[in-house]
């Protein structure tokens, strides 16, 4: 009698464990969410005044593959490096920068003079 009770208790325990193991807790599972989507960080689009919004920073400009973009950038850097290596080019660039600065100062002085004249005319009237 005790052996049959032990066997019966063991059988009930095994059935109970099997039911617990096989049971699953229902949860709301969205099939659109996969591990790749959840684990990968989302990038926000890069916005600026020149290109606008709607593309990610890692994307190249529309119509230009990334490899071509890298090649073009490398060639531009190489050309710029060879130009800056020559001393005469550096001197010419310095002269251009100084002339642009002088032109900017002249424009600012002319704008200030025009503003003073307008203010003087408004005061007289």
Swiss-Prot record:
Pfam families tied to this protein: CCAP
A biological process from GO: neuropeptide signaling pathway
Compartment(s) of residence: Secreted
Cysteine amide: modified positions: 53
Disulfide bonds: 47-53
Broad class of where this protein is predominantly found: secreted
Signal peptide: 1-22
Proregion positions: 23-42, 57-125
Keyword set includes Endoplasmic reticulum: no
GO cellular component terms given for this protein: extracellular region
Classification via InterPro entries: CCAP
Function, in words: Cardioregulatory neurohormone that increases heart beat rate during adult wing inflation; has no effect on beat amplitude. The effect of CCAP is both ino- and chronotropic.
Name the UniProt record assigns to this protein: Cardioactive peptide
Species name: Manduca sexta
Highest classification ranks of the organism: Eukaryota, Metazoa, Ecdysozoa, Arthropoda, Hexapoda
